[in-house]
Every structure is written in structure tokens, then in C-alpha cells.
């Protein structure tokens, strides 16, 4: 989340938001102003409840914490601009490495793939390119097209393997963002739909790590 100092009528208030990212803070403040204006009441009446606001599933959603203390976030970003926005939003929350796992969907917007790779290579410290929903396309070809924009990234076929690699890279102060699928619960590969959810897989991996430690 984030702690924010907000000045209202000359008085400074400290508020906490469970939401991550500057743009989400601005959205909350805009909504706060609209509600206050509509109901004719003071903004102060709503400040104490801001910490109860829940984010949209799959939108910069915090899904777990690695044993090292590193937070793990998922997001639906699947365009260069969206990927840029989330990486820029997450950077202030990272003291160590920003690790990004992402792919690109098949059968659409092929021209965006190298640009997504370029964005990740510039804004993330570790980039792992993997499969999204390849649909009827070759997953390997999609990854290779992304890699044109980030030749130093790690190319990992299989989303679960890529996420596992991302988790293994985490240390105290790091943050892992898994982009592209958000809260989706299925993956489309070669005309077949299989169950897969980023958050559920991460939780299974974290449970295994905790079990090994115990």
C-alpha cells in the first residue's frame, strides 16, 4: 500500500491506502471530491474510511509476500503503455530489484510485442519473457518477437516456470510483478483452454516454500 499526507483546509492528514500506484491515489482523490460535492458534505467525513477501499481484482493487485519480504503483484497490463504505467507506478515501492514476468497474447496486435519488450528492459531490473494466451500462434515465436525489444531478458517457455524463476530471484527489498493476465483463470494454448491463475499458482509456490522452511 501507500502512506500519504493530504492537506485539507490547511490541516494535514495522514492516510493509508491499500492500493498501489500514484494513479490509483489520484483516482481515489477524484472520487472523494465528486462524492463530497454531490452530497454536499466535507471531505473529512470520508478520510477515515479510505484504508478500507479495495482495488479492482487483477489491477496492481497484491497477491502475496515472499519469505524474503518481497511483495508480489499481478496486473492485466498487455500493451506497451499499460506495462509502462505499472512499472513506473511500482518503482517507488521498490528498494531493490523490480522483477517483471510478462508475455503477449497470440492472434492480435503483433506489432506491439517488441515495444513491450523495450519498455520492460528499460523500466524493470530483471525481465522474464513468457507465455500469455498464445492461442493459435507458436508460443516460441511470440516470445522471440518480444525478445527483439529486450535481448538481454530471460526467455522462459511455460508461464508457471517463468513465475517460479521470478520468485527465485527475489530478495529483501525486491518486488515481483506478473503482467498480462491479471485475475484471469484460464490460459488459451493451441485451441485448448486450460485452468491457470497467476495468483493461485503463486500462492501454491509460497506455501511450498514455507513448508520446506518448517
Which residues does each predicted region cover?
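A short glycine-threonine-serine/GTX helix/turn-capping micro-motif
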Residues: 15-22
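C-terminal accessory "lid"/substrate-recognition subdomains
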Residues: 5, 23-24, 51
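Acidic-glycine-rich active-site phosphate/pyrophosphate-binding loop
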Residues: 1-14
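ATP-dependent carboxylate-amine ligase
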Residues: 10, 20, 30-214
Amino acid at each position: 500500500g501507500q502512506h500519504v499526507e493530504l492537506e485539507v483546509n490547511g490541516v494535514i492528514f495522514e492516510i493509508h491506502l491499500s492500493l498501489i500506484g500514484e494513479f490509483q491515489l489520484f483516482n481515489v482523490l477524484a472520487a472523494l471530491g465528486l462524492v463530497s460535492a454531490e452530497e454536499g458534505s466535507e471531505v473529512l467525513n470520508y478520510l477515515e474510511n479510505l484504508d478500507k477501499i479495495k482495488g479492482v481484482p487483477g489491477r496492481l493487485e497484491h497477491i502475496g509476500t515472499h519469505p524474503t519480504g518481497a511483495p508480489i503483484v499481478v496486473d492485466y497490463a498487455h500493451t506497451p503503455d499499460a506495462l509502462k504505467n505499472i512499472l513506473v507506478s511500482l518503482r517507488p515501492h521498490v528498494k531493490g530489484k523490480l522483477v517483471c514476468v510478462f508475455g503477449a497474447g497470440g492472434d492480435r496486435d503483433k506489432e506491439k510485442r517488441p515495444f513491450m519488450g523495450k519498455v520492460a528492459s528499460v523500466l524493470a531490473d530483471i525481465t522474464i519473457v513468457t507465455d500469455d494466451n498464445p492461442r493459435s500462434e507458436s508460443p516460441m515465436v511470440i516470445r522471440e518477437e518480444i525478445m527483439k525489444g529486450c535481448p538481454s531478458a530471460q526467455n522462459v517457455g511455460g508461464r508457471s516456470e517463468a513465475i517460479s524463476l521470478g520468485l527465485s530471484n527475489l530478495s529483501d527489498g525486491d518486488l515481483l510483478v506478473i503482467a498480462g493476465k491479471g485475475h484471469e483463470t484460464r490460459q488459451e494454448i493451441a485451441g485448448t483452454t486450460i485452468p491457470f491463475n497467476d495468483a493461485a499458482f503463486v500462492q501454491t509456490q509460497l506455501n511450498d516454500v514455507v513448508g520446506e522452511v518448517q
